[in-house]
Amino acid sequence: MKETIAYLGMGMWGFSLANLLANNGHRVVGWARNPSLIEQLSTQRQHPAAPHVTIPSNLSFTSSMEEALDGATMIVEGVTSAGMRPVLNQLKSITDLQIPLVITSKGIEQNTGLLLSEIALEIFGKPAAKYLGYLSGPSIASEVLRGCPCSVVISAYDPATLKQIHQAFLTPTFRVYPNSDLKGVALGGALKNVIAIACGISDGFRFGDNAKSGLVTRGLHEIRKFATIMGCRPDTLNGLAGLGDLCTTCFSAFSRNTLFGKMLAEGLTPEQAKTKIGMVVEGVYTALSAHQIATHHKIDMPITTGVYRVLYENLDIQKGIAQLLQRNTKEEYL
């Protein structure tokens, strides 16, 4: 079945998936608030971050959410975590959720500590869980645009919704694996960004691959421990939504979070690094939310805590590294 898809958010990630869905034969209408971006996409048929990509004719664009939703059989969102609530509130003002809503962003809302899926349920109500889906996994936008092989997971509460979303996204090169642990999928995608900042700091100090692999492995342990206490399945974090996404984000030259950490090690302040990158660095905000939740539940997360203290308590990076290296070694548990 071919879908008519409203795609909310036309940043690099949103555009890459909208392009993939259109190339998979679906009619896609991309929505963004920025009128100049929509004008460029519509008239020049180019995305400013990917001018080399040919936009298929069945991918159109609008700055009117009502127009994007007209006739839609599926909604996909690709906005930042900070933009999630206002976009969903706008969506709620137009329609009740009666078709699948696929969340593709990764993060935890500041102040509330809610996952993006939990924001959706708060806005649309618990019955909307039937239509909720979550896509996550190792998926760098530029590689998705090039059609490189990629494996991700799709999670949903309702089996029929899961099947519909799975069929919409699956292509010969975009491998989609079902996973029923939606909360675990969401947490893996959010928390890995914090570990990626730590790995970027390691890169900036040229600590080498051994140190980075140690951070990834111990970081995965932190993510698994956090997710398990939150009621998720530990094996979810061993898969694409956890380990897979963590590896890609920490080792990719295209990762904003890793680049951000590297800039911190090179002497930039967090604000300077964010300005230089020029795009949202989700790990900065997730570090705060994750630290608050971990503190409340008494979860020991030394890497996450270290990143939080560097970003929000002005901890000297060298001192933070020394504190990590001086911790007692105990049973690995992995």
Swiss-Prot record:
Annotated EC: 1.1.1.94
InterPro entries, sorted: 6-PGluconate_DH-like_C_sf (IPR008927), 6PGD_dom2 (IPR013328), G3P_DH_NAD-dep (IPR006168), G3P_DH_NAD-dep_C (IPR006109), G3P_DH_NAD-dep_N (IPR011128), NAD(P)-bd_dom_sf (IPR036291)
Q: Write down the chemical reaction(s) this protein catalyses.
A: sn-glycerol 3-phosphate + NAD(+) = dihydroxyacetone phosphate + NADH + H(+); sn-glycerol 3-phosphate + NADP(+) = dihydroxyacetone phosphate + NADPH + H(+)
Q: Which UniProt keywords apply?
A: Cytoplasm, Lipid biosynthesis, Lipid metabolism, NAD, NADP, Nucleotide-binding, Oxidoreductase, Phospholipid biosynthesis, Phospholipid metabolism
Q: What does this gene product do?
A: Catalyzes the reduction of the glycolytic intermediate dihydroxyacetone phosphate (DHAP) to sn-glycerol 3-phosphate (G3P), the key precursor for phospholipid synthesis.
Give the family this protein belongs to, as stated in its UniProt record. Belongs to the NAD-dependent glycerol-3-phosphate dehydrogenase family.
* Predominant localisation class: cytoplasm
Task: Cite the GO molecular-function annotations of the record.
Answer: glycerol-3-phosphate dehydrogenase [NAD(P)+] activity; NAD binding
The metabolic or biological pathway listed in the UniProt record of this protein is:
Membrane lipid metabolism; glycerophospholipid metabolism
GO annotations of cellular component type:
cytosol
Where in or outside the cell it occurs: the entry states: Cytoplasm
The active site annotation covers K192
Give the UniProt record's GO annotations in the biological process aspect. carbohydrate metabolic process; glycerol-3-phosphate biosynthetic process; glycerol-3-phosphate catabolic process; glycerophospholipid metabolic process; phospholipid biosynthetic process
Please tell me where NADPH binds in this chain.
Answer: W13, R33, K106, A141, R256, V280, E282
What name does UniProt use for this protein? Answer: Glycerol-3-phosphate dehydrogenase [NAD(P)+]
SUPFAM superfamilies assigned to the protein according to its UniProt record, in alphabetical order: 6-phosphogluconate dehydrogenase C-terminal domain-like (SSF48179), NAD(P)-binding Rossmann-fold domains (SSF51735)
Residues reported to bind sn-glycerol 3-phosphate: K106, G137, S139, K192, D245, S255, R256, N257
Q: Which EC class is the enzyme in?
A: oxidoreductase
Pfam families for this protein: NAD_Gly3P_dh_C (PF07479), NAD_Gly3P_dh_N (PF01210)
